[in-house]
Structure formats: C-alpha cells, structure tokens
Curated annotation (Swiss-Prot):
Widely expressed. Residues 1-40 form a transit peptide. It holds the Pfam family ATP12. GO terms for biological process: mitochondrial proton-transporting ATP synthase complex assembly; proton-transporting ATP synthase complex assembly. Keywords: Chaperone, Disease variant, Membrane, Mitochondrion, Mitochondrion inner membrane, Primary mitochondrial disease, Transit peptide. Residues 13-40 are annotated as: Disordered. Its main location: mitochondrion. The gene is ATPAF2. This is ATP synthase mitochondrial F1 complex assembly factor 2. Interacts with ATP5F1B; involved in the assembly of the F1 component of the mitochondrial ATP synthase (ATPase). Interacts with FMC1. Plays a role in the assembly of the F1 component of the mitochondrial ATP synthase (ATPase). Belongs to the ATP12 family. It is linked to Mitochondrial complex V deficiency, nuclear type 1: A mitochondrial disorder with heterogeneous clinical manifestations including dysmorphic features, psychomotor retardation, hypotonia, growth retardation, cardiomyopathy, enlarged liver, hypoplastic kidneys and elevated lactate levels in urine, plasma and cerebrospinal fluid.
Length: 289
C-alpha cells in the first residue's frame, strides 16, 4: 500500500510543474460518492475538454488545474486537498482519462468532492456513528446453517478476522445464524467510536465508503491496519457469492467486471483513508516525541 503511495508521489511530481496550456474550458464538477452518502447526479461520461493537468499549492492546501482553470467541486467550491500525495493521486485520475472522461472511474475525486461539499451536512460524530452502524449488518457476522461446506468455509475464513479484531481492539464481536443478526455489545461500539474519533473527517468519509463497499466494518478495519490486502478483503466480503459461483458457474464477463469494480472502489477508498491520515499521524507522532 505504502509503496503504491510512494510511486504515486514520485511518478506524479511531473504534474507539479507541468506547463499549463490548451484551449480554455469551463470546469465541470467531478463524480460524487455513491450510497450511503449520495447527493449528486453528475454525467457518467463527457468528452475530455482539457489537455494538461497540474498541481499548485495554495493557502488552503493543494489545488488541481485543468489547463489554466482550477478544478471546483459540484457546489462550486475550490477543489483543495490537504496533502501533496492526495493531490498527485487525484491529478493522476484526471490525467489518465482518454478522449472521454469517465467520471465513474474517478473514486478519489468523488471522495474529495464529498469531503469538501459535505452534501449530507454530517459532522464528525455523525460520520463515526454511521461507520460503526455497519457492525449491525456486518457481512462476516452473518452465518448460514447449511450446507456444511459453506458453514465450514465461513468459519475457516471469517473467524480468524473476527478473532484478530477482538484482540486488536479489546472488544467482543459475535456471529449469528439468526436473520436478526448478532448482538453487538455496547462496550464494543464505545471502543470503536473512540478509535474512529482519532481520524479526521476526510478519513472518516473514506472509512464509511469502504465499509459500504465491503458491507463490513470488521473487514474495513483489517484493511486500514494492513491486516488484509484489498484482494483478500474483497474476496472475504464475497465469500458466499464466490462459493455459489464455484458450485453453479457464472456469467464470466459480468462476474469479472463486478469483481474488478469492487476492487477498484475498495482500493481507492483505502488509499484515500491513508493519504488523509498521513499528515495527522505524523504530526501526532512528532508531538508525542
């Protein structure tokens, strides 16, 4: 994960001093976050209207320039991000678009727009509680009673992650075969609320986004703590689907597309969390020293 961040930083520095140019163009808002915090309905595609992408540092952070125009959010706010690494990653999204801009592929831009505009008007406490609420319907806490092969598969693949989370955070996370789901102790919620409070609102937007993709807070925590890779987390979130596919077969192209899309969204969300937490974490460590 961090090697990927460094490659983005090093490979993208050319964007910082790239000369602006090309025909003038009016700015178009980028994509925005899907459920659970959907608020915008941008076009899915449009013809590319810029030639060059560059980054400049302003008073409020790092800005993205498309030719000589500054990128803005759907609510017409200046698109400004808190770190150079995140700016490079977003600029790379825009620079990698070909003749057609495919907004639905630009997940980092989506998350930045949501963080800047806050279309649902939620504060930090509300973001934290929205993320913790995923425990109530956490994918890996819902178990089947049959067939035995799937029961065993869920036990072998999901139990180690639950055990890791319980040990890592000092909490209790149970599983259940009931349609009502497991009963999550109040202490578990309190501990996770306290833990998530250490993140800034940008990172919390990313955490909720990843949890929504995986339908699991436990798997999201595993990703953040580098206990799981993106590929592992996605496969664990789709354990029953993959079991059924292996048993009954699938429409190959549809399955492959869905899997790749889920990986892309999850990877982007996880990268967003780390890039938004980086400066805060470093500052916290320096203060402690």
């Amino acid at each position: 994960m961090w090697r990927s961040c460094l490659r983005l930083r090093d490979g993208g520095r050319r964007l910082l001093n790239r000369p602006a140019g090309g025909p003038s163009a009016s700015m178009s808002p980028g994509p925005t976050i899907p459920s659970p915090a959907r608020a915008y309905a941008p076009p899915t595609e449009r013809k590319r209207f810029y030639q060059n992408v560059s980054i400049t540092q302003g008073e409020g952070g790092f800005e993205i320039n498309l030719d000589h125009r500054k990128l803005k959010t759907p609510q017409a706010k200046l698109f400004t991000v808190p770190s150079e690494a995140l700016a490079i990653a977003v600029a790379t999204e825009w620079d990698s678009q070909q003749d057609t801009i495919k907004y639905y592929t630009m997940h980092l831009t989506t998350l930045c727009n949501t963080s800047l505009d806050n279309p649902t008007q939620r504060n930090k406490d509300q973001l934290i509680r929205a993320a913790v609420k995923f425990l109530d319907t956490d994918t890996i806490c819902y178990r089947v009673e049959e067939p035995e092969t799937l029961v065993e598969l869920q036990r072998n693949e999901w139990d180690p992650i639950i055990e890791w989370a319980e040990k890592r955070y000092g909490v209790e996370i149970s599983s259940s075969t009931s349609i009502m789901g497991p009963s999550i102790p109040a202490k578990t919620r309190e501990v996770l609320v306290s833990h998530l409070a250490s993140y800034n609102t940008w990172a919390l937007q990313g955490i909720e986004f990843v949890a929504a993709q995986l339908k699991s807070m436990v798997l999201t925590l595993g990703l953040i703590d580098l206990r799981l890779t993106v590929e592992q987390a996605v496969l664990l979130s789709r354990l029953e689907e993959e079991y059924q596919i292996q048993k009954w077969g699938n429409i190959e192209w549809a399955h492959d597309y869905e899997l790749q899309e889920l990986r892309a969204r999850t990877a982007a969300g996880t990268l967003f969390i780390h890039l938004c937490s980086e400066s805060t974490t470093v500052k916290h460590k320096l203060l402690k020293e």
